[in-house]
UniProtKB/Swiss-Prot annotation:
Entry keyword set: Cell membrane, Membrane, Transmembrane, Transmembrane helix
Ribonucleoprotein recorded as keyword: no
Protein origin, superkingdom: Bacteria
Source lineage: Bacteria, Pseudomonadati, Pseudomonadota, Gammaproteobacteria, Vibrionales
Transmembrane segments: 132-151
Stated name of the protein: Toxin coregulated pilus biosynthesis protein R
Annotated membrane topology: Single-pass membrane protein
Length: 151
């Protein structure tokens, strides 16, 4: 697996205006330099990929979230930065690169946050299913009335 940092001016072949690159790979350091992180294969086996986005929905920003059951999650400038393994492997202190607050969460606290999001999603799905049922029921009633009227 190859992981590299490139200065933004060296990053020629990818359109950085594309939202997916802005969200995952762009990082502005405290000294004002802009860098882009490229990883040829993402390994998300140890992190539920939805957790960082759930935390962002909870209003977390410019935080390093440490947990006992998950890899560290850095949410910086409203972006989930997915390069902490690379930084750690190369003895680069993320604390020296960007300014953020460190938050310690137990795995069960993260799971509660996840569960709240899952409950909200289940309620949304149930509402959608109810709307589909009601529309289907109304359609059947209209068709039945139409059939009896034609007879």
């Amino acid at each position: 697996m190859t992981s590299i940092w490139l200065h933004e001016s060296d990053f020629r072949y990818v359109n950085l205006d594309v939202e997916r690159y802005q969200k995952k790979y762009r990082l502005t350091l405290t000294n004002g330099n802009k860098y882009v992180f490229i990883k040829d294969k993402e390994d998300i086996s140890d992190v539920n990929p939805f957790i960082p986005y759930i935390l962002m929905e909870e209003g977390m920003n410019n935080v390093l979230v440490k947990s006992d059951d998950y890899k560290d999650i850095l949410i910086y400038q409203g972006v989930n930065i997915q390069c902490l393994d690379f930084l750690n492997d190369n003895d680069i202190s993320v604390e020296k690169l960007v300014d953020f607050e460190t938050v310690e969460l137990k795995a069960d606290e993260l799971n509660k946050i996840k569960a709240r999001r899952l409950d909200a999603q289940l309620i949304e799905d149930e509402v959608k299913n109810n709307k589909v049922f009601i529309i289907g029921f109304i359609a059947i009633v209209i068709i039945s009335i139409g059939v009896f009227w034609l007879m």
